[in-house]
């Protein structure tokens, strides 16, 4: 019996009960007290997140499977962000596929129909054959499940760094729609309701919550990875939505399996469950295996006795297993029986109140180098534009059916944000952002930066952010420097979210992301922001002769930038100036609404040069006068590659549009810095440089397909 509980925690349990727990009871406590389910090392700090707002229908609430935001006309969007990092490191196909399945079940547990997915993937450098194997199978797993179940992938991220060599990050966000008055809770409020389980229970995913709450130890943990079955998942999706108004609560059986799902659903009430009534995929499972199995495509419903028959008949019509396995009781005891014998009897007060930890912190010593490396300008441009993080993701997106369901407005990769249509006719933009290189330098500024970047990304299509879900991914929280990075990232995310008025309605924390030598990954907090188009949306367009206009002010803040990663760090990290971020984003949205611009791109990874790449790869050239870039430095390298926030590149076809932008700027810098040329794949710089980027553009289109062809 392998547990994630510490010896001190085991002693706490013994003292609370006044006895030695049975083996099955240890499994129950281990699942509910796991880091994965209890947030025991993070919850103290997560309380600083803003979770209330005029659009919040369901925020960060205990045991709710997803958050919800009001989008008008009686409709709500349901948001959830999850990961399957540890499973994907062992079995990338099933790890990624079941991550998609889990997020979809979280959405339908609120009675919402899933309409969009995002995937944010980080693996090690692709010169390593195992990393290529991981990437190919992760993408294949996502496509297998998403395509089979009919939910489009509308946006995402794909990035590479040696920090993820042993521990890839596979984040999936889901979005669904539901009438506000039809949202189903995940917890019960009364005793006497029947517990109805659908789906078969097998051996896969045994102890998955405990597995995700400790360091990876090797491929011998394959049994902790769940097996995906999207065709069963499609039945669960359709029938759950069909019977959602006939039940009192719905819960997906995710991390921790049956024991976690039912205990959280009880929300302090008692339960009595007969394990031998559970439909099994494998004969002769032990009670302990049944309790903590994480077999996929299973849901639990709280149902009034008189409605049990119609609920089960709906599933049985498709020959999908459905069974009444117990009921919620008036006491506070969590009881599981097997063939008439009680195998678990634990108080909910023990299970739902794990110890909370506030580990020691040690301030990370951030290095600031003010001596600029000797960098050749042309070499820098070519190195940045060839970097794998910036290449086309079409190889991945082409494996997803991103237009299924008819709600996709912009194809993935077409703009900085995904854009989907809602049932009320409104358009919703959604985007995920992380910046581990910056977080490794300063996790507080990184927390602020990623929220601001997500806000900018939405602005490029004409949308204003309305809410956030987050995922905080770090190493071992007991290591003081790691825990310091976590605490500081939370502080930064909380500050920026409050400032932008984008409450955090859900999230997840994933610790113990380390390589085989125990070295933690770069801190990788991730936010996914949703926003509503305010009036018009912008489909990016590029024309010869269009003016290239920079909105915002460039600063010599090179720390954590892509240039610094390649050539060596220098300068301080970007300081996120929230007022500039807000004003520049509002200016872009207003320009879109008034038809003043035809293209918008936020300046982030790769700086100005990175922001110009979408123009170059569409068969155009650019001419840039670096003297016209508003900046606090004369250093051309900094002007071209700084990644400080609050900045955009926009294109305009009329000269008077520039005057209009200046008149509406409210103190934000607006400057024409160049124009789009017809000379394909060429960048002209004022310094007399004509840089032919044909090779880099070809690399942009072909890199992922070629590197994964082995």
Swiss-Prot record:
Domain of life (superkingdom): Archaea
List of residues binding Mg(2+) 1: 82
Subunit (UniProt): Monomer. Part of the FGAM synthase complex composed of 1 PurL, 1 PurQ and 2 PurS subunits.
Encoding gene per record: purL
Active site (record annotation): 36, 84
Protein name: Phosphoribosylformylglycinamidine synthase subunit PurL
One GO biological process term: 'de novo' IMP biosynthetic process
Binding site for ATP: 39, 80, 470, 507
């Amino acid at each position: 019996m392998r547990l994630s509980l510490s010896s001190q925690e085991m002693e706490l349990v013994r003292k609370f009960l006044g006895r030695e727990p049975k083996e099955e009871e240890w499994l129950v406590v281990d699942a509910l007290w796991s880091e994965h389910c209890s947030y025991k090392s993070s919850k103290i700090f997560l309380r600083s997140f803003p979770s209330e707002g005029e659009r919040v229908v369901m925020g960060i609430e205990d045991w709710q499977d997803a958050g919800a935001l009001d989008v008008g006309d009686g409709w709500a969007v349901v948001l959830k962000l999850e990961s399957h990092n540890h499973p994907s490191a062992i079995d990338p196909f099933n790890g990624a596929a079941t991550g998609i399945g889990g997020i979809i079940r979280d959405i339908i547990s609120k009675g919402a129909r899933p309409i969009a997915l995002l995937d944010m993937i980080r693996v090690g450098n692709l010169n390593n054959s195992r990393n290529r194997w991981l990437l190919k199978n992760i993408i294949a797993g996502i496509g297998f499940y998403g395509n089979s179940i009919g939910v489009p992938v509308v946006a995402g991220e794909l990035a590479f760094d040696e920090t993820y060599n042993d521990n890839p990050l596979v984040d999936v966000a889901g979005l669904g729609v539901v009438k506000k008055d039809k949202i189903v809770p995940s917890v019960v409020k009364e005793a006497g309701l029947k517990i109805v389980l659908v789906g078969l229970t097998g051996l896969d995913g045994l102890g998955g919550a405990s597995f995700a709450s400790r360091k990876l130890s090797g491929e011998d943990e394959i049994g902790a990875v769940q097996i995906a079955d999207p065709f069963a998942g499609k039945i669960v999706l359709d029938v759950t939505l069909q019977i959602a108004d006939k039940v009192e609560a719905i819960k997906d059986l995710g991390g921790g399996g049956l024991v976690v799902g039912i205990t959280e659903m009880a929300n302090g009430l008692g339960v009595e469950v007969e394990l031998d009534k559970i439909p099994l995929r494998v004969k002769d499972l032990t009670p302990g295996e049944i309790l903590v199995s994480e077999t996929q495509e299973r849901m639990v419903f709280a149902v009034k006795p008189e409605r049990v028959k119609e609920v089960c008949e709906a599933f049985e019509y498709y020959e999908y297993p459905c069974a009444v396995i117990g009921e919620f009781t008036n006491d506070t005891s969590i009881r599981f029986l097997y063939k008439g014998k009680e195998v678990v009897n634990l108080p909910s007060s023990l299970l739902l109140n794990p110890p909370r930890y506030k580990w020691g912190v040690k301030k990370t010593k951030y290095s600031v180098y003010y001596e600029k490396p000797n960098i050749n300008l042309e070499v820098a441009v070519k190195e940045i534009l060839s970097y794998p993080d910036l290449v086309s993701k079409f190889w991945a997106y082409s494996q997803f059916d991103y237009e299924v369901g008819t709600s996709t407005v912009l194809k993935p990769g077409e703009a900085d944000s995904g854009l989907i249509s809602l049932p009320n006719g409104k358009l919703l933009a959604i985007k995920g952002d992380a910046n581990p290189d910056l977080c490794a330098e300063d996790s507080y500024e990184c927390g602020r930066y990623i929220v601001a970047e997500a806000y900018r990304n939405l602005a490029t299509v004409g949308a204003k952010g309305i809410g956030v879900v987050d995922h905080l991914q770090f190493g071992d929280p007991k290591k003081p420097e790691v825990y310091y990075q976590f605490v500081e990232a939370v502080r930064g995310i909380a500050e920026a979210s409050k400032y932008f008025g984008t409450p955090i309605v859900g999230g997840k924390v994933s610790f113990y992301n380390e390589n085989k030598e125990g070295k933690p990954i770069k801190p990788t907090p991730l936010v996914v922001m949703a926003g509503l188009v305010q009036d018009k949306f912008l489909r990016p367009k590029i024309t010869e002769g269009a003016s290239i206009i920079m909105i915002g002010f460039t600063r010599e803040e090179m720390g954590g930038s892509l240039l610094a990663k390649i050539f060596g760090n220098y300068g301080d990290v970007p300081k996120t100036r929230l007022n500039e971020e807000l004003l520049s984003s509002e200016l872009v949205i207003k320009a879109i609404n008034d038809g003043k611009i035809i293209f918008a791109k936020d300046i982030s990874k790769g700086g100005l040069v990175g922001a110009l790449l979408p123009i170059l790869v569409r068969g155009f050239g650019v001419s840039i006068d670096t003297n016209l870039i508003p900046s606090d430095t004369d250093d051309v390298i900094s002007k071209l590659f700084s990644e400080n926030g609050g900045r955009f590149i926009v294109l305009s076809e009329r000269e008077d549009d520039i005057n209009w932008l200046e008149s509406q700027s409210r103190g934000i810098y607006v400057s024409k810095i160049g124009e789009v040329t017809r000379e394909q794949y060429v960048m002209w710089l004022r310094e007399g440089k004509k840089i032919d980027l044909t090779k880099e553009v070809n690399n942009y289109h072909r890199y992922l397909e070629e590197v994964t062809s082995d």
